[in-house]
Amino acid sequence: MSPGRASSVSLMLLLLLSLAATVKAAAIIPQSSACPNTEAKDFLQNVKVNLKVFNSLGAKVSSRRPSDYLNRSTSPWTLHRNEDPDRYPSVIWEAQCRHQRCVNAEGKLDHHMNSVLIQQEILVLKREPESCPFTFRVEKMLVGVGCTCVASIVRQAA
């Protein structure tokens, strides 16, 4: 048997094995009475969801990676992994400001400026309820996407 043929046979066996494991795993998951009946004729078997986000700015967008900014900013941040297997997307990277203050050109903290988290609301798909493996709901989620500098609020004693 040729190497190409052997690898395609191996791939086919691997796919069959994973399908068998999936079917076996699906049979074990207990179904709540609140779950929709997936065997019913009127149950929608396939749903196509377009999750692509189109860039309305086209070629005007900089090709510079966002990771360049998190270190060069006067309000630097770190990215933290937020993982939830019952959510799509299951992994979301969230920003957290490194300091309460901003960093000046010399790399020292500027006590006249505050570092503030920039947040963006996104939509995610959440599995609902946990006992219904094929049911999802749309949920809003507030995600930190970066940090910026703002002037400190100075209150004068009267």
Curated annotation (Swiss-Prot):
Keywords attached to this entry: Adaptive immunity, Cytokine, Disulfide bond, Glycoprotein, Immunity, Inflammatory response, Innate immunity, Secreted, Signal
A molecular function (GO) term: protein homodimerization activity
GO cellular component, one term: external side of plasma membrane
Tissues in which the protein is found: Expressed by Th17 cell lineage (at protein level). The expression pattern reflects the differentiation state, with IL17A-IL17F heterodimers produced at higher levels than IL17A-IL17A and IL17F-IL17F dimers in fully differentiated Th17 cells. Expressed in innate lymphoid cells (at protein level). Expressed in gamma-delta T cell subsets (at protein level). Expressed in iNKT cells (at protein level).
Name of the protein described by the UniProt record: Interleukin-17A
Residues annotated as signal peptide: 1-25
Keyword Iron-sulfur: no
Pfam families xrefs: IL17
Alphabetical list of InterPro entries matching this protein: Cystine-knot_cytokine, IL-17_chr, IL-17_fam
Effect of deleting the gene: Mutant mice are born at the expected Mendelian ratio, are fertile, and have no apparent phenotypic abnormalities. They are protected against chronic autoimmune and allergic reactions, as observed in models of spontaneous or induced rheumatoid arthritis, experimental autoimmune encephalomyelitis and chemical allergen-induced contact hypersensitivity. In a model of acute intestinal injury, mutant mice show epithelial disruption, presence of abscesses associated with enhanced bleeding into the mucosal lumen and increased cellular infiltrate into the submucosal layer.
Biological processes annotated in GO: adaptive immune response; cellular response to interleukin-1; defense response to fungus; defense response to Gram-negative bacterium; defense response to Gram-positive bacterium; fibroblast activation; gene expression; granulocyte migration
Cysteine disulfide partners in this protein: 97-147, 102-149
Compartment(s): Secreted
Subunit structure: Homodimer. Forms complexes with IL17RA and IL17RC receptors with 2:1 binding stoichiometry: two receptor chains for one interleukin molecule. IL17A homodimer preferentially drives the formation of IL17RA-IL17RC heterodimeric receptor complex. IL17A homodimer adopts an asymmetrical ternary structure with one IL17RA molecule, allowing for high affinity interactions of one IL17A monomer with one IL17RA molecule (via D1 and D2 domains), while disfavoring binding of a second IL17RA molecule on the other IL17A monomer. Heterodimer with IL17F.
Main location: secreted
Induction: Induced upon differentiation of CD4-positive T cells toward Th17 effector cells upon antigen receptor binding in the presence of IL6 and TGFB1. Up-regulated by IL23A-IL12B, IL1B and TNF and inhibited by IFNG and IL4. Up-regulated by pro-inflammatory cytokines in response to microbes in various immune cells: induced in innate lymphoid cells upon fungal infection, in Vdelta4-positive gamma-delta T cells upon C.mastitidis infection, in Vdelta5-positive gamma-delta T cells upon S.aureus infection and in Vdelta1-positive gamma-delta T cells upon E.coli infection.
Similarity comment text for this entry: Belongs to the IL-17 family.
Function: Effector cytokine of innate and adaptive immune system involved in antimicrobial host defense and maintenance of tissue integrity. Signals via IL17RA-IL17RC heterodimeric receptor complex, triggering homotypic interaction of IL17RA and IL17RC chains with TRAF3IP2 adapter. This leads to downstream TRAF6-mediated activation of NF-kappa-B and MAPkinase pathways ultimately resulting in transcriptional activation of cytokines, chemokines, antimicrobial peptides and matrix metalloproteinases, with potential strong immune inflammation.
Glycosylation sites: 71
